[in-house]
Amino acid sequence: MQTFHLLTRHLPILEQDSIGEWMDLNHDDDPLGDSFIPSFFVYSPAVEKFIADVYHFAAVCPEFHMKKHVQTLQNNSITSVFDADASTLDAHCILAMIMHVIRGERFREGYLADALQHGHMKNWLERLTELEK
């Protein structure tokens, strides 16, 4: 049974596709020089689909309690998802880390991009693949 296929199917796409780019809408030619628009990250369609599938998985598989990702991380003494050793964690923890990064994007622009660029998301999805065997 492939419980995590909705998420793990994105592995090849996330490895090959450009994840997106930073957008900076500020211009040097602003006549007043007083307007400022914070930079933001625009994700590729493949990453946007992955994000949508994470939320869909959380909705259709409530037994993983992904909405309580912070509590799951705290209960497992995970203070930094980027420093945690995924090879020793169960599916609940891996899914909590994935949701933590997706939700964290709302508070820190580019948080998901960091997880993708540094291979953390790839490692977590590979761990879910291992756990399915």
PLM region spans:
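N-terminal leader regions
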Residues: 1-2, 6-7
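Eukaryote-skewed repeat-based solenoidal scaffolds used as protein-protein interaction platforms
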Residues: 7-11, 115
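Extended alpha-helical scaffold segments
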Residues: 13-17
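Charged, low-complexity interaction regions
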Residues: 18-37, 41, 59-64, 82-88, ...
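Repeat-associated, polar segments at repeat-unit boundaries in modular proteins
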Residues: 60, 66-72, 120-128
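Short, charge/polar-rich alpha-helical segments
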Residues: 75-93
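Heptad-repeat amphipathic alpha-helical coiled-coil interaction surface used
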Residues: 91-99, 105, 114, 118-132
